[in-house]
Every structure is written in structure tokens, then in C-alpha cells.
Regions:
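Alpha-helix initiation and N-capping motif
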Residues: 3, 27-31, 266-267
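A residue-level detector for the "anchor" residue at the start of short, highly conserved motifs
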Residues: 34, 43-51, 61-350
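Short helix/strand-capping connector loops at secondary-structure junctions
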Residues: 11-18, 306-311
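Hydrophobic core
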Residues: 57-59
Length: 350
């Protein structure tokens, strides 16, 4: 059975037991490497992040459909009728479906090259003296993982249900992109032009580093997790904090003053998605199902209200939706029913 192959190590923790064991959680646990793994309007808290680092984590605005929550479309033309396809919106407004490139290399536009295997690379040299930049937008649907190489050599891994807008070639003063969803960046070094990732909740400024950004709307917070180097986080009314490796800085999206909270964390847990892993630490069923919705491209509908349960574990990337739900169901008080692309969650009958 495939269920028997699921590497989940799932451990259920009741709410009461969680409170007793919370301080005992080992956040420095080691994990294997894996493979694969926007937005309701809420109070807009701008967070500035200046990075002098080698590796850090961030995540940007995303959305999980919970009981029919509506999703704001940034590029309507590209979204209509193309929800399951990877779309590239060119500077001319033309929308190109690049989901199923049959060739290993396809020239799209003045040096842009498309490679098969969910990878897009820009090889045009930077326009250091060009007055107006030409922007492209890459739209990644649910259930898809994509690799983008920008014109300066910066590598970006995009998680499911994400969008990134960027210049085809960067200008002479800075390199700036905007992100919705989640992206893991390996920024090419350039001491003369800082690299900026702009999101609805935070900005990240670097010269050459590797990081992952996270401000999914449905998570209720924006945060930065640092693996190497130093990061300066600024938010609210001029408050700023510097964090060191093994720590995270987070801002509650509902905090009007946008105070920054710094704490220790397991960095490998937060960057696991880039290598194709579900990684949970005392995660509620609600949190798990949010990720299930994004990764498997399904809508989750919770038909009843019941007490939350918490889990610790991980799942390899080749597990089917049915197998994952079967494992969760075997150690949970809920049952699942899958009809096409909808997962119904029900409380088990006694």
C-alpha cells in the first residue's frame, strides 16, 4: 500500500497536552532533504528588512480557500481559464502558457529562454542605461513548483499559488521584484545594486544572499527566519531589530503598532518546502489543510466545528493526496471525503 510508504511520523497532540509540552519542543531537530513545495485584504503592515546574510527565510501573501473565501486576481487576463497552467505575462500584455514546453529550449522574447522541467531562464544582459524597464510576470497555480533564473543570474524557486513580477533586465541602481505567495531566492552578488523583494507586508533588501520570504495572508503573520549572516528587520513606527542565525523575527498582521517579536527557531523546518517537504511542528489540523490545499490544488471545506488537534511530522513529496489524508485520518478524530477537487472534512461518527 502507498499509505505504508508515507514517511509521516505523525504524532497527535491534544490541546491540553500541547500546553504541557510546549516548552519541551526541540526546535533544533534535523531533517532530510526533500523536493517540491494570495490574497484577502487585511490591514497593510509594511515591514522593511535589510539583509547582510547568506541564507534567510521569508514568505509572501497567499490564500487558502476556507468555506469559499474569495481570491483577488492581480492579472485577470492570465487567470481566466488558465487556473491550472503556468502563465508568463509579457511586457506587451501577451499571455503565454508555458506549462508544457515540449522542447528543451524555446526562445520567447529577445533572449528569454524557456527550458522544460518547470524552469524559465533569462539570458538577456542587464539594461544598465535603459530608461524604462520592461516587466514580465510569472504566475504559478496551485499544485505546481517552478524555478526561475533572472537576467542577473539570481535563482528563484516559487511555491504553489505564487506570482512574481520582475524586469526582463535590471537597471543600473537596483534590482527589484515583487512577490505574492512564497519564493526562495539565491541572489547573485552585486555590491553596486541591492536586490529588493517587495511584498504587501514586507520588503527585503540584499546585495547577494540566499533567503526564503513568508507573509501568506492566511498565516496571520509576516516573519523572517535567518540561517546565516545578519538581518535587520524594521516595521511599524520605526522599530527595528537585528536577528542572528537560528532566530526568527515576526510581526502579527493584526498588530496596529507592528511590534517585532524575536525568538529561536528550527531553520530547516521553515525552508523544507523548497526541497519538496511538508514539515510540521505542533501544527494544527487547520494549518496542515491550508498547505494541502495549496500543494494539491484542492478546495477544503470544513463541514463541522470541532476542537483542534496538533501534529508533528513530515511527508515526502511523492505522496498522493489520498494517502496523505488516509494517514491523517487514521490518527485523527476527523474523516475526509474527496470529490473531484474538493476535500470535505467531517468529524468521525462514534
Amino acid at each position: 500500500k502507498e499509505v505504508e510508504r508515507v514517511f509521516f511520523n505523525l504524532q497527535r497532540i491534544s490541546t491540553e497536552e500541547l500546553e504541557k509540552r510546549y516548552d519541551e519542543v526541540d526546535v533544533n531537530m534535523k531533517w532530510e532533504d526533500f523536493k517540491k513545495r494570495q490574497q484577502q485584504g487585511r490591514r497593510n503592515i509594511r515591514v522593511g528588512v535589510t539583509v547582510a546574510a547568506s541564507i534567510c527565510l521569508l514568505i509572501t501573501s497567499g490564500l487558502w480557500l476556507w468555506l469559499g473565501g474569495a481570491r483577488e486576481e492581480r492579472v485577470v487576463l492570465a487567470e481566466q481559464g488558465r487556473q491550472n497552467n503556468v502563465c508568463l505575462v509579457l511586457s506587451t500584455g501577451e499571455v503565454v502558457d508555458i506549462s508544457n514546453a515540449e522542447q528543451d529550449e524555446v526562445k520567447l522574447d529577445k533572449g528569454t529562454k524557456l527550458y522544460s522541467g518547470n524552469r524559465l531562464e533569462y539570458v538577456r544582459p542587464d539594461s544598465l542605461h535603459k530608461k524604462e524597464l520592461e516587466f514580465n510576470q510569472l504566475i504559478i497555480p496551485k499544485g505546481t513548483f517552478y524555478h526561475l533564473v533572472l537576467s542577473d543570474g539570481t535563482k528563484v524557486w516559487l511555491n504553489a499559488d505564487s506570482k512574481i513580477k520582475y524586469p526582463v533586465s535590471f537597471g543600473k541602481d537596483k534590482r527589484e521584484v515583487s512577490l505574492h505567495g512564497e519564493g526562495y531566492f539565491e541572489v547573485a552578488k552585486d555590491s553596486t545594486r541591492p536586490f529588493i523583494v517587495s511584498t504587501d507586508k514586507m520588503d527585503v533588501k540584499v546585495l547577494g544572499t540566499t533567503f526564503d520570504v513568508n507573509t501568506y495572508e492566511d498565516e496571520g503573520k509576516s516573519f523572517v527566519v535567518l540561517v546565516e549572516g545578519l538581518v535587520e528587520v524594521s516595521a511599524g513606527k520605526g522599530e527595528s531589530r537585528i536577528i542572528t542565525p537560528g532566530h526568527m523575527a515576526e510581526v502579527n498582521m493584526y498588530d496596529v503598532q507592528a511590534k517585532i517579536q524575536v525568538s529561536k527557531c528550527d531553520t530547516e523546518h521553515y525552508v523544507a518546502w523548497k526541497n519538496g517537504n511538508f514539515s510540521f511542528r505542533n501544527a494544527s489540523l487547520t494549518e496542515i489543510l491550508k498547505r494541502v490545499s495549496r500543494y494539491y490544488d484542492v478546495t477544503v471545506i470544513r463541514e463541522q466545528v470541532f476542537e483542534e488537534e496538533y501534529y508533528t511530522g513530515d511527508v515526502s513529496s511523492d505522496v498522493s493526496l489520498e494517502s496523505l489524508l488516509a494517514v491523517i485520518e487514521s490518527s485523527n478524530s476527523v474523516s475526509f471525503k474527496v470529490e473531484r477537487k474538493i476535500v470535505y472534512v467531517q468529524k468521525k461518527r462514534d
